[in-house]
UniProtKB/Swiss-Prot annotation:
Alphabetical list of PANTHER family matching this protein: LIPOYLTRANSFERASE 2, MITOCHONDRIAL-RELATED, OCTANOYLTRANSFERASE
One cellular component term from this protein's GO annotations in UniProt: cytoplasm
Reaction equations catalysed: octanoyl-[ACP] + L-lysyl-[protein] = N(6)-octanoyl-L-lysyl-[protein] + holo-[ACP] + H(+)
Key word Transferase present: yes
InterPro entries found in the cross-reference section: aa-tRNA-synth_II/BPL/LPL, BPL_LPL_catalytic, Octanoyltransferase, Octanoyltransferase_CS
Protein source organism: Sphingopyxis alaskensis (strain DSM 13593 / LMG 18877 / RB2256) (Sphingomonas alaskensis)
Function: Catalyzes the transfer of endogenously produced octanoic acid from octanoyl-acyl-carrier-protein onto the lipoyl domains of lipoate-dependent enzymes. Lipoyl-ACP can also act as a substrate although octanoyl-ACP is likely to be the physiological substrate.
Subcellular location: Cytoplasm
NCBIfam families: lipB (TIGR00214), PRK14341.1 (NF010921), PRK14345.1 (NF010925)
Major subcellular location class: cytoplasm
EC id: 2.3.1.181
Name the UniProt record assigns to this protein: Octanoyltransferase
Residues that hold substrate according to the record: R73, G74, G75, R76, Y77, T78, Y79, H80, A145, I146, G147, G158, F159, S160
HAMAP family reported for this sequence: LipB
């Protein structure tokens, strides 16, 4: 089968309004489904906010100090804000295997591979979605979140990676419903890494991520 076109790669400067990003994702998903637009990888940064997934428990919103949005994705509460790289991945799974679990597994692997290029040994954790590593005290800590939605086999949302956010902002929620593990970042691990380096690592590991998604016959 011929190879698929490489998804459009967009990096938005500054802070992107969350509601506007949601509307843009929905519009693009409809266009991809209608074969009126190609797939897209959209890298951006949001102002401080909390998002609630479809499994969010209101008791886990401890201090709504920032705006709270219903995201429509799977999962529970998470935080987005300055210093965090957000990746919205919009792929057509009718062309890439129609396997949501394989997609989520590959998405986790993409972020893990990118972190390896940045000198961070990250991993999956059994029963806990997301990207995990050891913090400077040797504790298992979350450095990245995964939250996806699939609509008519087109993916929406994606991942967030903590580059240098204010980690105290996570204390307003129980991140992803997991209270017993801390949150960390590249900066907290002593990695003086900016968005340009993170984006370059993601770009280098993108082909391997796409290769894991088997094109449908």
């Amino acid at each position: 089968m011929p190879s698929l076109p490489v998804p459009q790669w967009i990096v938005s400067p500054g802070l992107t309004d969350y509601a506007a990003a949601l509307a843009d994702m929905e519009s693009r998903a409809a266009a991809i489904h209608a074969d009126e637009a190609g797939e897209r990888i959209w890298l951006l940064e949001h102002p401080p906010l909390y998002t609630a997934g479809t499994s969010a428990d209101p008791a886990e919103l401890l201090d709504p100090r920032f705006p709270v949005y219903d995201a429509g994705r799977g999962g529970r509460y998470t935080y987005h804000g300055p210093g965090q790289r957000v990746g919205y991945v919009q792929l057509d799974l009718t062309r890439r295997g129609r396997d949501v679990r394989a997609y989520v597994h590959a998405l986790e692997g993409w972020v893990i591979d990118a972190l390896a290029l940045l000198g961070v040994k990250a991993r999956r954790a059994e029963g806990r979605i997301g990207i995990w590593t050891d913090d400077v005290r040797g504790r298992e800590a979350k450095i990245g979140a995964i939250g996806v939605r699939v609509k008519r086999w087109v993916t929406l949302h994606g991942f967030s990676l903590n580059v240098a956010p204010d980690l105290t902002h996570f204390t307003g929620i129980v991140p992803c419903g997991i209270a017993e593990y801390p949150v960390t970042s590249l900066a907290a691990l002593g990695k003086a890494t900016g968005f340009s380096e993170v984006d370059a690592a993601l770009a280098r590991t993108l082909p391997a991520f796409l290769d894991k998604l088997r094109p449908s016959d």
